[in-house]
Amino acid sequence: MLQVQLLLIADTHVPKRAKDLPAVVWDAVACADVVLHAGDWIVPELLDELEGRARRLVACWGNNDGEELRRRLPERADVALEGVRFTVVHETGQTPGREARMTAQYPDTDVLVFGHSHIPWDTTTETGLRLLNPGSPTDRRSQPFCTYMTATVADSTLLDVVLHRV
């Protein structure tokens, strides 16, 4: 059975919040088959480096990203990995009603990866849509820790979703 190892990151804010990604995140990039980045890069140099170091990158731009990043990345990135349909976006709006809004907005998605809030999130809607926000590896805001997520896709199933502290 083929397994795909995933790294989920968002809101990296390099170099405003950190000069670079933490070493543990670069280690996770090296181990991942696919890196999913849900926007707010800030500078294109980080995109260049991640494109060079990741085996595969699926990414979108965020509200803090400028013209070059918006030219190079979509607002919404869709990919199917081993039978699981992923959508990567930056913003999903306010917390109240998020599941209902996202279910209506993304009817053909199995897993929605998002960012913006810097607040980790892992829920599943009544229809089975999985909502994942990995938090931020560089800017914890009101959270106790900076974070990122890893997961595995195998046999058309998302497995082993883990929130990691930086």
Regions picked out by a protein language model, each given a short descriptive name:
Residues 16-27, 88-106:
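Pre-active-site segment of Zn-dependent metallo-hydrolases
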Residues 1-52, 65-74, 83, 144-147:
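N-terminal active-site segment of His-dependent metallophosphoesterases
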Residues 53-54, 127:
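Short, structured coil segments at secondary-structure junctions
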Residues 76-77, 120, 149:
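Residue-level detector of beta-strand structural context in well-folded domains
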Residues 8-10, 34-40, 58-63, 88-90, ...:
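Active-site neighborhood of phospho(di)ester-bond hydrolases with catalytic His/Asp-centered motifs
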Residues 54-96:
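Helix-adjacent hinge/juxtasegments
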Residues 2-3, 9, 81-82, 104-108, ...:
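Binuclear metal-dependent phosphoesterase catalytic core
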